[in-house]
Amino acid sequence: MMKKVILLISTLIFLFSIAYAGNFGVGIIAGEPTGISFRLWQNKVNAFDFGIAWSIDANILHVSVDYVTHNYGIFKPTSGTMPFYYGIGLRILAKDNANFGVRVPLGIIFIPKGTTLDFFFEIVPTLNLVPATNLDVDGAVGFRYYF
């Protein structure tokens, strides 16, 4: 199992290395689970989100990757932007046995004007597929700094 986690982390590092200025963010995600959040913008509307986090309650490592799309027309702050985002992704839980599921991230991200930061809130329903089929819901708040 650890070989798979190391392979996934290596793949993420490769993807991050192709990022260009201002499109790659790293930050903290707090909630269930808590850890590190990465975002790689593809354009103004689409991005890849990656997470490596630890579940305090269940003592499990979470590794996730999502493809998200942003809708800028719902919320209109007076300064900056605040799109609603939604997408699809995958999650692996690593403990004694591997647990694999499909995620549907739903969130709001605030991007202050003139900064290299974003702040986000998300709820992520997840359909676990292996080793058993069941539904999970994770939630978190966080921020990222963009390079």
Task: Please give the residue ranges for each predicted region.
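Cleavable N-terminal export/targeting peptides
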Residues: 1-23
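Short loop/turn motifs that connect adjacent beta-strands in outer-membrane beta-barrel proteins
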Residues: 19-23, 44-45, 72-83, 96-98, ...
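Residues that define the transmembrane beta-barrel architecture of outer-membrane proteins
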Residues: 22, 32-34, 46, 59-63, ...
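Transmembrane beta-strand segments that form the barrel wall of outer-membrane beta-barrel proteins
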Residues: 22-32, 42-56, 84-94, 119-127
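Residues on the lipid-exposed face of transmembrane beta-strands in outer-membrane beta-barrel proteins
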Residues: 28, 36-40, 52, 65-71, ...
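Gram-negative outer-membrane beta-barrel proteins
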Residues: 34-36, 56-58, 73-75, 94-98, ...
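N-terminal, post-signal-peptide region of Sec/Tat-exported proteins
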Residues: 44-80
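Predominantly the C-terminal beta-signal and adjacent terminal strand-loop region
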Residues: 113-147
